[in-house]
């Protein structure tokens, strides 16, 4: 079957925002206007098309990235609706990795919120061009220009309106397009009855006068903001700059082309206005997706490495190139089993054919290829460059794996996975649940790389870790619903880490003689602290074979196994460099096991002088409270070992930004509610790991049954 839409007419976009900014409702309206659905489902009624999991419909939030395909004015738009809740940040990250552009949805009353900052930072890391949609213009307190100021103040983003709203709150009646200088005035609730007029024309004046608006004021405002738009875009386009300084009129097509170029280069962020719930501005937002966000042809060729030669390689977006794709999500479907979502960067792929998973070095057969619309599916025979689809039948593929033509191997840049910050103990309620729980947890961990399952070596308990209480709550809930496993769940615990704060060298010597073959392993290892977030690095600096080459991997393995159960309180150790530089062996008695034990002994010896420290997750906390409660909040932060970072006024509220240890935030919602009579709110996002104070460290060590020395 031939390609239905050309690459130039394809858009792969994400819709991302802070929780409750209205992303899913915006996506619903897109599906309605593009003819994908014929009845609009409301998120707050639990009827949304994109929120298809039972938990999503009950909680009114988006947990997984639902993918769907829509068509708009002769273009194919693949849309991924991503969660805004911080606990599901991996869903945003893996979506951004495979998208070409994104729509950032803001709540026009609040502007940029904490999770907006997080997703914006992630999008910047991946170089994703964005347009901004100021949603909820009909809401009490909606302020388009305040939202614009927060983009600059909180994100440092070069955002400029390409539209301005007519009215706000209950009086939000339309939008002026600053590029075309036309207005859209909505005369019915479905947003389908639209009056389009030229700004400043008699018709425009009459329409606004009939609705009690001052047309002259809006004409002036539109001219002023158009001038600012041209001035801003002139920085990125010499032709426009020349025309602007010469006082010449700038044609619509030229202005559009200049905005598109600056947006694709991630120099400029066009800002739009609307109310998805009231069906206003969504069609204009869709037009902006086509006009200003890139097609797969507009972005640089995807970079990778040839696994055979270790040389850099790339794949331009073309059907003629060898097949290359990235698996960005694994999901278990109750009807078809394991689904692997993938983005095709180059080449084509037919159902029933074979691909090579270059990340794992395994051949995989593509059973069926499905095009997804939330949780319904359409079977297709072929996928082309630029497509997003799901494959059935991939047994070994996990998130971040590269799938390529067997004759043209390439490993594409993978997806970075954040470390879990919270953990809890789970145990099956009955013996019958025991085996089922193991299978269920394994399947859930396959789907979600930020979800870890471990067994405590000392107690034999199963410990699950994730990005937050809601994250683990949803996964335990899924275990019950999808796998019919009943489990008892312990109280949430902080996922502490351990590290070394000083450099040292230590010897690990292991010798055992008990008749027959003995054991002999002897190593000298230099330990130094690594950069934060850099993880564990092992270097083999052995010269002259004093430790035979075949035993070196055992030394590394011994260190890794020891680090899994740290030296102070049994927490995983991170950010340490280890250099094996000397040792000795015995011709007969040396073995892998002996060197593994020797490495473990060296690390435990090093702990005596390497100043081991316990690290705790620090959360970036944003607390919004009425002015009269500000004093209480400052007290809350200080009492929780927190540090106030900044404060700002927003209307009659105060916004406090602070860093607070996660350990001190359990139960804070109740404290805040009672001290503000329910008027205060807070959001927290994981920021970094930091050393715990000595007194707290001693408490943690004592609690874990270790000695503080």
UniProtKB/Swiss-Prot annotation:
Membrane spanning residue stretches: none
Record keyword Amino-acid biosynthesis present: no
GO molecular function: GTP binding; GTPase activity; translation elongation factor activity
One GO cellular component term: cytoplasm
Positions of the tr-type G domain: 8-297
InterPro entries assigned to the protein according to its UniProt record, in alphabetical order: EF-G-like_DII (IPR053905), EFG_II (IPR041095), EFG_III (IPR009022), EFG_III/V (IPR035647), EFG_IV (IPR047872), EFG_V (IPR035649), EFG_V-like (IPR000640), G_TR_CS (IPR031157)
GO biological process assignments: ribosome disassembly
Entry annotated with the keyword Ion transport: no
Subcellular localization(s) per the UniProt record: Cytoplasm
Binding site for GTP: 17-24, 81-85, 135-138
Keywords: Cytoplasm, Elongation factor, GTP-binding, Nucleotide-binding, Protein biosynthesis
Family, per entry: Belongs to the TRAFAC class translation factor GTPase superfamily. Classic translation factor GTPase family. EF-G/EF-2 subfamily.
Function in brief: Catalyzes the GTP-dependent ribosomal translocation step during translation elongation. During this step, the ribosome changes from the pre-translocational (PRE) to the post-translocational (POST) state as the newly formed A-site-bound peptidyl-tRNA and P-site-bound deacylated tRNA move to the P and E sites, respectively. Catalyzes the coordinated movement of the two tRNA molecules, the mRNA and conformational changes in the ribosome.
NCBIfam families for the chain: EF-G (TIGR00484), PRK12740.1-3 (NF009379), PRK12740.1-5 (NF009381), small_GTP (TIGR00231)
Protein's name according to its UniProt entry: Elongation factor G
Organism: Lactococcus lactis subsp. lactis (strain IL1403) (Streptococcus lactis)
């Amino acid at each position: 079957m031939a390609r239905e839409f050309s690459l130039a007419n394809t858009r792969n976009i994400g819709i991302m925002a802070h929780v409750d900014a209205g992303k899913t409702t915006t996506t619903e309206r897109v599906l309605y206007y593009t003819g994908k659905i014929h009845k609009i489902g409301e998120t707050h009624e639990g009827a949304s098309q994109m929120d298809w999991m039972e938990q999503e419909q009950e909680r009114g939030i988006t947990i997984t990235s639902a993918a769907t395909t829509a068509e708009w004015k002769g273009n194919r738009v693949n849309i991924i609706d991503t969660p805004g809740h911080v606990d599901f940040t991996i869903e945003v990250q893996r979506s951004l990795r495979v998208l070409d552009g994104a729509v950032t949805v803001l709540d026009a009353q609040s502007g940029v919120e904490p999770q907006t900052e997080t997703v914006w930072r992630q999008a910047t890391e991946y170089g994703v061009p964005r347009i901004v949609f100021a949603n909820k213009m009909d809401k009490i307190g909606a302020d388009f220009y305040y939202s614009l100021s927060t983009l600059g103040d909180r994100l440092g983003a070069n955002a400029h309106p390409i539209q301005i709203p007519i009215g706000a709150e209950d009086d939000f009646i339309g939008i002026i397009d600053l590029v075309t200088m036309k207005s859209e005035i909505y005369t019915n609730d479905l947003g389908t009855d639209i009056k389009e007029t030229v700004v400043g024309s008699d018709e425009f004046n009459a329409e606004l006068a009939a609705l009690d608006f001052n047309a002259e004021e809006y004409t002036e405002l539109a001219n002023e903001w158009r001038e600012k738009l041209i001035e801003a875009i002139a920085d990125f386009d010499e032709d426009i700059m020349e025309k602007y300084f010469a006082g010449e009129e700038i044609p619509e097509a030229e202005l559009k082309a200049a905005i598109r170029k600056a947006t694709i280069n991630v120099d400029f962020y066009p800002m739009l206005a609307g109310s998805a719930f009231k069906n206003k501005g969504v069609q204009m937002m869709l037009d902006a997706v086509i006009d200003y966000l890139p097609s797969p042809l507009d972005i640089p060729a995807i970079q990778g490495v040839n696994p055979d030669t270790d040389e850099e390689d790339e794949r331009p977006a073309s059907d003629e190139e060898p097949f290359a794709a990235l698996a960005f999500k694994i999901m278990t479907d109750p009807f078809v089993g394991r689904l692997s979502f993938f983005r095709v960067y180059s080449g084509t792929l037919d159902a029933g054919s074979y691909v090579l998973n270059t990340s794992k070095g395994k051949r995989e057969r593509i059973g069926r290829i499905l095009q997804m619309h939330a949780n319904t599916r359409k079977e297709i025979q072929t996928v082309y460059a630029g497509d997003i689809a799901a494959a059935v039948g991939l047994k070994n593929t996990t998130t971040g794996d590269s799938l390529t033509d067997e004759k043209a191997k390439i490993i594409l840049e993978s997806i970075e996975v954040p470390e879990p910050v919270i953990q809890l103990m789970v145990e099956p309620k009955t013996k019958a649940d025991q085996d089922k729980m193991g299978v269920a947890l394994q399947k859930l961990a396959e789907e979600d790389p930020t979800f870890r399952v471990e067994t405590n070596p000392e107690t034999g308990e199963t410990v699950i870790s994730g990005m937050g209480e809601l994250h683990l709550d949803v996964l335990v809930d899924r275990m019950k619903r999808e796998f019919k496993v009943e489990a008892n769940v312990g109280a949430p615990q902080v996922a502490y880490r351990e590290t070394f704060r000083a450099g040292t060298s230590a010897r690990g010597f292991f010798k055992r003689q008990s008749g027959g073959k003995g054991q002999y392993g002897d190593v000298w290892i230099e330990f130094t602290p690594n950069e934060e977030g850099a993880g564990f690095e092992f270097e083999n600096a052995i010269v002259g074979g004093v430790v035979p080459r075949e035993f070196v991997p055992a030394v590394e393995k011994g260190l890794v196994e020891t680090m899994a159960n740290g030296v102070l309180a049994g927490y995983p150790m991170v950010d340490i460099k280890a250099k094996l530089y000397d040792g000795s062996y015995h011709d007969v008695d040396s073995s892998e096991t002996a060197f593994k034990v020797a490495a473990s002994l060296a690390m435990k010896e090093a702990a005596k002088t390497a100043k081991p420290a316990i690290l705790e997750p620090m959360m970036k906390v944003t607390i919004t409270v009425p002015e009269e409660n500000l004093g209480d909040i400052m007290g809350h932060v200080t009492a929780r070992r927190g540090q106030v970072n900044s404060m700002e006024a927003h209307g009659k509220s105060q916004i406090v930004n602070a860093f607070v240890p996660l350990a001190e935030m359990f139960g804070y919602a109740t404290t805040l509610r009672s001290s503000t009579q329910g008027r205060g709110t807070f959001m927290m996002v994981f920021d970094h790991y930091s050393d715990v104070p000595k007194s707290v460290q001693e408490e943690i060590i004592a609690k874990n049954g270790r000695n503080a020395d």
